[in-house]
From Swiss-Prot:
Organism encoding this protein: Leptospira borgpetersenii serovar Hardjo-bovis (strain JB197)
Biased composition (Acidic residues): 1384-1404
E.C. number(s) listed in UniProt: 2.7.7.6
Keywords: DNA-directed RNA polymerase, Magnesium, Metal-binding, Nucleotidyltransferase, Transcription, Transferase, Zinc
Protein known as: DNA-directed RNA polymerase subunit beta'
Residues annotated to bind Zn(2+) 2: 778, 852, 859, 862
Binding site for Mg(2+): 449, 451, 453
Length: 1404
């Protein structure tokens, strides 16, 4: 027998009237529901037993047949079949309508499908359906065309004139007739022909119409089925009616809606039978149409039908929509049995794989197992009495409970479950009380703390489920964070504090001899006798050598695995995590778990022994604070007076003040930490808590003992009045008031941002849920290049970290020997990465999900390593969901962390100079330099300084026996020459040899430092610069415009009162001339400098402050105007989350920058079209035409007449638009940009996410292409199509000898891409449910159930992990029902950390 769950795909389509009749078991003729006296369903009513089946099992309505033996008999008296009452959930009825009505989904949705087919607008359709206008069906010789609307008078006029030949109609009848007359095939052919004739068609409506026509043609649906003659009635159990106490009834809204339809339908039938006047009948028909509309989709109507208490009734569509709808409430998330929840408390005595389960809960959760066991042991004769025993809580029940619970894993979950580590499995240990006990080290993964958090517990029942739980979900298998491969189980808080105290060292008195010991036992004895302290320096004979260490460190080293290098340093939380990662790398998870439990024990033990506490005295305020604050006040005063004299603007003064306070705050913090460090011999508890990473950050301690510093307003602006006090001294009233801003913003943000982050995660999951690892190798030749990430000069992410866990895409070759070190497709482990780094590579090509060519999902080689286990990913791994969780989870975390600092603002100290931290040689200075009055070299346009790191330099005569030649690459430590005295000279770093003019140099990488206009250069080409020597100086607060020649100023299109505003500063009475936007007039503001016959023009952007008057004389290098840069706002993820959001949604930024479409030379024409300046780019290739570029007048242009630009360069200021990058620079550039930008936001917050997760999502955003030329394919121009389908179709057409289609890639944001998935189930359960289903039904779409969501919805196993196709045929055999047996466990011994297996044996 075929089970109803055994199918591969689901198709959705329009139902024909015959189909609806086929489903139905009878017609519902009366609006009655149940008889108020007998409470039995009324015959022919909405709950009729004859139609829908009996309400009592195996019993007919009248009671003639009353037992299972009459199964299938239909009662001759009442006509009810004797069957199960369950059939009332599946049997449908129908209502025969007296007049056809239109289905609201097809005429009211945008775009209206019916409207597209008939080429009518929604309003026209409505006026026909609602009996306002006639529509022409057959125009005869009237000269009108089919489908035109006419009013009553015209209709009668035409009738009189042309008689029966002229046919027009009104209402749904007419629409149905028109739809039935459409020849879908012919229409579609005609439109295709039209499109080809017109070429490059742009009318979207025609394309849309073609799409709908072809949908009907290909799906076998008939257009007239969109008009209903017969309405299905859903089974009564799905719209139940229940009796409340007090004899009243609660009913589903659908019953009310159905009743209205039946009432109106019956009334219409009567009126037609009575041959009532047309006007009355029409009104009734209109009301029937409205009733059916309300039944199908009440929320779409302007005035929804209201029920009791003025509440809109819930129609069939509303049942599906939204968070409370069928999809999201019941299909994607169900409540499950065998679960419980309780408060959690810490269980420091537990092992890493255990949890404490309260006996009360265990009794309920394991009830069936206990009952079965009681019967097996003959402690109860049958299940029923066993149940009684359990409920009475007899003594033997608890003995059995121990046995049943043993080795039966349970799952713990803490909401919100933001990533897969929010559910983990543990082995239960029974405990007294009512609270669940949780191991302290798994808290971080759950983001749990013990301030009243609750957790839910779930029991896996079947042997298969238990096995999976045990093998995959047990906490020891989840030590690493899937987002980045770092341990997530690191110790925190008291454990860290204990370990830090244990491994720290007391300062020893100078010259005092060290006590010596020969082994660990002696040291223990000495501690017990009080001869030495845990932190005293001693010397000890250990592992064959004499060490200088402390007893505490010796004790700590006993818990590390054998053979691990001796750890001889104080361990903060970061250090401990490093050791955990290292042990995992070298010894695997089993040893790591054992070590974790030992670390936990040690940490708690010694935190208790050393018992640090903090008192107010421990918060030491630095004595230097008063002086520093005094200096700052003087500097602020100075800035104020400069402003009053008019030397600087108010904005500059403000920035200066903020900078002064930021700097002062940093200085105070520094001196405070020095003070704390000296206090109590380096063991000040406040300092230790911060230093060890146990609690508190530098930020927080700075506020306790330094100064609170600058605060931000809710808008993110910084208040320039700094808070000079700290919490130890106490705040003044004003300071307290300023502080409240930040504190409140913190709380408000947390509430709002958590929802945003949750929604981001939901969209990410939705777009990437069907990315599953599907094959071993897709065989692509494509790859991406990954390299070091730098910020200025600092390496933020090393090459090793960047390429870890990827497969190489090319052979890695040793640059010295030219041998292949690692062939293509080598998995890059830490070791491999280190070696590649040592070879001097700063970037290599690796495989990536972005370039993977798998049909479904991605392949192992392109994805690389599974970050949660550091082994290659396996087929069936749901990498898409993991990627989504890895990106979404920190979003939520970070927003929840804003408020801990209490809104203290941090502004960057503005740099005024360019410098590098090493000795360098200036290779080149790009850009136009002019010499000003002070004879300084000034950049008059944007440019750059190219500097190369100088590693070593010798005169050639100082060297003998050169081993290298000019241009050769050298490695660190490579021998390059010997000196005359015979000493070896080796390279200090990887670099390249450079020999010229008798000088031998080893040079490192080049750095290009971009500089802005007005920068003063202090160096010349070929200068050798010292570390941190200022290379160039600039104004950090303003962008400037600089004159390139001496001459006289002439204002052009600058008029005071029109586009120049005179701002008088009230406090200083200085006058500022500021350029403002002028909408009405076509002004192109610029300043010209005229000298003899030559003139130079400079465009002046909006917001510029003009520094010269009309007619002034200026010298080359003088400033003509300044543009103040926007005040720095504080950046936290509050700014960050919206940024991630707009990147993933691919939104166009407000003021997008313009990119150069081609390489070429700029010509600024000076013409203005529609408030935009016009520029031309003359391409390098003379055959190409010049490219016109328009830029809004207000924007600052980055280029000048005669500049050369490269394709993709920014021409004006503004933010990059991802769509432009894709269009101009191509897919690769866009991918790199998106990954980098998203990483940037998270990196600012100190969150590590592996690139591959972001790549998986970006891959999904670039799935579609836009057809630009359809060739001989079945595509239409401007159609969006899946890239894979596009390639397949092209292959087919080429094979048949046709011309292939051409397309451009398009970028879709998360929401758009999710709604465009192949699976309509997935899209419908995401957003816009009715729209998706309408569309799918017309197209007759088939859902092949490839993704995870679709399968969850219909209750299949998901096609990932053990549900993958290739595992479908494997079955698990069990010798006994209940728990896992010994033999199974032995087979899997490898997978289960030894500690667990040992433990479980030892407890019996």
């Amino acid at each position: 027998m075929r089970s109803h769950n055994d199918f591969e795909s689901i198709t959705i389509r329009l139902a024909s009237p015959e189909r609806i009749k086929e489903w139905s078991y009878g017609e519902v003729k009366k609006p009655e529901t149940i008889n108020y006296r007998t409470l039995k369903p009324e015959k022919d009513g909405l709950f009729c037993e004859k139609i829908f089946g009996t309400t009592k099992d195996w019993e007919c309505y009248c009671g003639k047949f009353k037992s299972i033996r009459y199964k299938g008999v239909i009662c001759d008296k009442c006509g009810v079949e004797v069957t199960h009452s369950k059939v009332r959930r599946e049997r449908m009825g129908h209502i025969e309508l007296a007049a056809p009505v239109s289905h609201i989904w097809y005429y009211r949705s945008v775009p209206s499908r019916m409207g597209l087919l008939l080429d009518m607008t929604v309003n026209q359709l409505k006026s026909v359906l609602y009996f306002e206008k006639y529509v022409i069906i057959d125009p005869a010789d009237s000269g009108r065309s089919r489908g035109e609307l006419i009013d009553e008078e015209e209709y009668h006029g035409y009738l009189d004139e042309y008689g029966d030949k002229f046919v027009a109609g009104i209402g749904a009848d007419a629409i149905k007739e028109l739809l039935a007359r459409i020849d879908v095939d012919a229409e579609a052919r005609m439109i295709r022909q039209k499109i080809q004739d017109k070429d490059k068609i742009s009318d979207k409506r025609i394309l849309k119409r073609l799409e709908v026509l072809e949908a009907f043609r290909d799906s076998g649906n008939r257009p007239e089925w969109m008009v209903l003659d017969i309405v299905p009635v859903i089974p009564p159990e799905l719209r139940p009616m229940v009796q409340l106490e007090g004899g009243r009834f609660a009913t589903s809204d659908l019953n009310d809606l159905y009743r209205r339809v039946i009432n109106r339908n019956n009334r219409l039938k009567r009126l037609l039978a009575l041959k009532a006047p047309e006007i009355i009948v029409r009104n009734e028909k209109r009301m029937l149409q409205e009733a059916v509309d309300a039944l199908f989709d009440n929320s779409r109507r302007k005035r929804a039908v209201k029920g009791k208490g003025n509440r809109p009734l819930k129609s069939i569509s509303d049942m599906l929509k939204g968070k409370q709808g069928r999809f999201r409430q019941n299909l994607l998330g169900k409540r499950v049995d065998y679960s419980g929840r309780s408060v959690i408390v810490v269980g420091p005595e537990l092992k890493y794989h255990e949890m404490g389960l309260p006996k009360k809960m265990a009794l309920e959760l394991f009830k069936p197992f206990i009952m079965k066991r009681l019967v097996d042991l003959d402690l109860a004769p049958n299940i029923k009495s066993a149940k009684k025993k359990v409920e009475a809580e007899d003594k033997e029940v608890f003995d059995v409970l121990e046995y049943v619970v043993k080795e039966h894993p349970v799952m713990l979950n803490r909401a919100p479950t933001l990533h897969r580590l929010g559910i983990q499995a543990f082995l239960p240990v029974l405990v007294e009380g009512k609270a669940i006990k949780l191991h302290p080290l798994v808290c971080h993964a759950f983001n749990a703390d013990f301030d009243g958090d609750q957790m839910a517990i779930h029991v896996p029942l079947t042997p298969k489920a238990q096995l999976e739980t045990w093998m995959l979900m047990l906490s020891p298998h989840n030590i690493l964070n899937p987002a980045n491969g770092h341990p997530i189980c690191g110790p925190t808080q008291d454990i860290v504090l204990g370990i830090y105290y244990l491994t720290s060292e007391l300062p020893s008195e100078p010259g005092a001899p060290l006590k010596s010991f020969s082994n660990l036992d002696e040291v223990h004895y000495a501690i017990d006798r009080g001869v030495v302290e845990f932190r005293t320096k001693i010397s000890v004979y250990h592992q064959g050598k004499i060490l200088e260490t402390t007893p505490g460190r010796l004790i700590f080293n006993t818990i590390l695995p054998e053979g691990y290098a001796y750890v001889n340093r104080p361990l903060s939380d970061k250090e401990t995590n490093r050791i955990i990662a290292d042990v995992y790398d070298k010894y695997g998870p089993a040893k790591t778990v054992l070590m974790l439990d030992d670390i936990k024990k040690l940490g708690y033990r010694y935190a208790t022994l050393f018992a640090p506490t903090i008192s107010i005295e421990d918060i030491r305020v630095s004595p230097g604070k008063v002086g520093l604050v005094g200096d700052a006040n003087k500097e602020v005063e100075k800035a104020d007076s400069e402003y009053r004299k008019g030397i600087i603007t108010n904005e500059e003064r403000r920035k200066k003040v903020i900078e002064i306070w930021t700097k002062t705050n940093d200085l105070i913090t520094e001196s405070m930490f020095k003070e704390l460090e000296k206090d109590k011999g380096g063991f000040n508890p406040v300092f230790i808590m911060a230093a060890s990473g146990a609690r508190g950050s530098k930020q927080q301690i700075r506020q306790l003992a330094g100064m609170r510093g600058l605060m931000a307003k809710p808008s993110g602006e910084i208040i320039e009045l700094a808070i000079r006090s700290n919490f130890r001294e106490g705040l003044s009233v004003l300071e307290f008031f300023i502080s409240t801003h930040g504190a409140r913003k913190g709380l408000a943000d947390t509430a709002l941002k958590t929802a945003d982050a949750g929604y981001l995660t939901r969209r990410l999951v939705d777009i990437s849920q069907d990315v599953i690892i599907s094959e071993d190798d897709c065989g692509t030749e494509e790859s991406i290049s990954l390299g070091i990430v730098k910020e200025g000069e600092n390496v933020i992410v090393s090459l090793n970290d960047r390429v870890f866990g990827r497969y190489t895409a090319e052979d890695v070759i040793d640059p010295v020997t030219d041998k292949v070190v690692y062939p293509r497709n080598t998995l890059i482990t830490r070791e491999v990465g280190q070696k590649v780094e040592n070879l001097g590579y700063d970037k290599i090509r690796v495989r990536s999900p972005l370039t993977c060519e798998s049909k479904q999902g991605v392949c192992i080689r392109c994805y690389g390593m599974d970050m949660a286990r550091l082994i290659p990913a396996e087929i069936g791994e749901a990498v898409g969901t993991i990627a989504a969780q890895s990106i979404g989870q920190p979003g939520t975390q970070l927003t929840m962390r804003t408020f801990h600092i209490g809104g203290a603002a941090s502004a960057k100290v503005q740099e005024k100079e360019h410098k590098v931290s090493y000795t360098g040689i200036v290779n080149n200075i790009n850009g136009r330099l002019i010499t000003n009055e002070k004879s300084q070299s000034v950049f008059s346009r944007r440019g750059s300084i190219v500097i190369q790191r100088l590693i070593q330099q010798y005169k050639t005569e100082e060297l003998s026996n050169l081993r290298v030649e000019n241009g050769q690459k050298v490695d660190k430590g490579e021998l390059v020459a010997t000196s005359p005295s015979g000493e070896n000279i080796t390279s200090a770093m990887p670099g390249a040899v450079h020999i010229e003019n008798g000088i031998f140099r080893i040079l490192g990488e080049e750095a290009v430092i971009p500089v802005k206009t007005g920068t003063v250069v202090n160096v010349k080409v070929n200068d050798i610069t010292q570390p941190n020597q200022p290379l160039a100086e600039f104004d950090p607060y303003n962008e400037v415009g600089i004159s390139e020649i001496d001459g006289t100023v002439q204002w052009m299109d600058l008029e005071i009162g029109k586009n120049v505003r005179r701002d008088e500063d009230l406090r200083t009475s200085n006058i500022l001339l500021k350029v403002i936007e002028q909408r009405r007039e076509k002004l192109n503001p610029r300043i010209a400098v005229i000298s003899g016959g030559s003139r130079e023009e400079y465009s002046v952007p909006v917001d510029a402050i003009i520094s010269v008057q009309d007619g002034d004389k200026v010298k080359a290098g003088d400033i003509l105007f300044k543009i103040p840069t926007v005040a720095e706002k504080t950046r936290d993820i509050t700014g960050g989350l919206p940024r991630v959001d707009e990147l993933f949604e691919a939104r166009r930024p407000k003021d997008a920058t313009t990119l150069a479409e081609t390489d070429g030379k700029i010509e600024i024409s000076g013409e203005i079209v529609k408030e935009k300046r016009v520029l031309y780019i003359h391409p390098d290739n003379p055959d190409q035409e010049k490219v016109k570029v328009t830029i809004p007048i207000g924007k600052q242009i980055r280029v000048r007449n005669g500049d050369f630009v490269k394709r993709g360069d920014q021409i004006d200021d503004g933010n990059l638009d991802p769509h432009d990058i894709l269009r101009v620079k191509g897919v690769t550039a866009l991918q790199v940009y998106l990954v980098q930008e998203v990483q940037e936001v998270y990196r600012l917050q100190g969150v590590h996410i592996n690139d591959k997760h972001i790549e998986v999502v970006v891959r999904q955003m670039l799935r579609k292409v836009l057809i630009t030329d359809s060739g001989d394919t079945s595509f239409v121009n401007q159609q969006q199509i899946d890239r894979l389908m596009f390639n397949e179709e092209n292959k087919r057409v080429i094979a048949e000898g046709g011309s292939p289609a051409e397309s451009v890639p398009i970028l879709l944001g998360l929401t758009k891409a999710s709604l465009n998935t192949e699976s309509f189930f997935s899209a419908a359960s995401f957003q816009e449910t009715t729209k998706v289903l309408t569309d799918a039904a017309i197209k007759g779409k088939t859902d092949n159930l490839m993704g995870l969501k679709e399968n969850v919805i219909i209750g299949h196993m998901i096609p990932a992990g053990t549900g993958t196709k290739k595992y479908k045929d494997i079955s698990v055999f069990k010798s006994a029902y209940g728990d896992l047996d010994r033999p199974l466990e032995e087979e899997e011994e490898e997978e289960i950390p030894q500690s667990i297996a040992d433990d479980s044996d030892g407890d019996e």
